[in-house]
Amino acid sequence: MHYPTALLFLILVNGAQAFRICAFNAQRLTLAKVAREQVMDTLVRILARCDIMVLQEVVDSSGSAIPLLLRELNRFDASGPYSTLSSPQLGRTTYVETYVYFYRSHKTQVLSSYVYNDEDDVFAREPFVAQFSLPSDVLPSLVLVPLHTTPKAVEKELNALYDVFLEVSQHWQSKDVILLGDFNADCASLTKKRLDKLELRTEPGFHWVIADGEDTTVRASTHCAYDRIVLHGERCRSLLHTAAAFDFPTTFQLTEEEALNISDHYPVEVELKLSQAHSVQPLSLTVLLLLSLLSPQLCPAT
């Protein structure tokens, strides 16, 4: 293969990268928990798979767990720095949780964010909505709406999540939205019959990419699709590549007991294909330099 052809091939391949968005219930994440070596090591490897990750059930009162986790993540993954965006502490009682976004800041940036105004107090932990830029001509921005429902009010909260979608899509004048998180949308918390009556199931345009039969739990004794990702918007759906729960115990060769020290949930992930022309542009100066260096070999003097 000639050098120019090879370089062009590399550029095109480089421009066809997937963009992975994840959600993970980290099960009562505290400073004491992340300070444990195996927990930290596993969390960092899970986070490093994702371009954007929404951590749920962060209950650290010290305010030190996330900065420590971010520092270790950036030490582990040298491909580009991660940044974080955290919600306020959310909850009705003294028990509160925080949603935390981890994102690769050289690939995406937070354009705007807010906590949904839950005037009727439907949500135990109201969604922390964020709009992110994407390296895509087809879909230059995307709205994420994470939710961790309470098992006692799953149906009520998920029906209210449809209202959140309507408000968010009007706020940003965009139908390209991803709803994601630990919905508790299966087994004893929500039967299949009740699930199928949700407005997020009956209204057109919502694509549940984590299937009802998927297992998002670590314990061998359970098989429940608690954690979900729901896509909306034609542009968003057109870029869909894959979606699945990530079986981290098998991948990282952990026993069930070791895995449960991390969480009793699997992360859920969706990959979008962002193979757009402007993804290639940052390489252009490098390519020109390489071509100039190779030019004597390509065009020898006569």
Curated annotation (Swiss-Prot):
GO terms for biological process: DNA catabolic process. Keywords: Disulfide bond, Endonuclease, Endoplasmic reticulum, Glycoprotein, Hydrolase, Nuclease, Signal. It is found in: Endoplasmic reticulum. Disulfide bonds join 187-224. One of its GO terms (molecular function) is deoxyribonuclease I activity. It is an enzyme of class 3 (hydrolase). Pfam families: Exo_endo_phos. GO terms for cellular component: endoplasmic reticulum; nucleus. This is Deoxyribonuclease-1-like 1. The lineage of its organism: Eukaryota, Metazoa, Chordata, Craniata, Vertebrata.
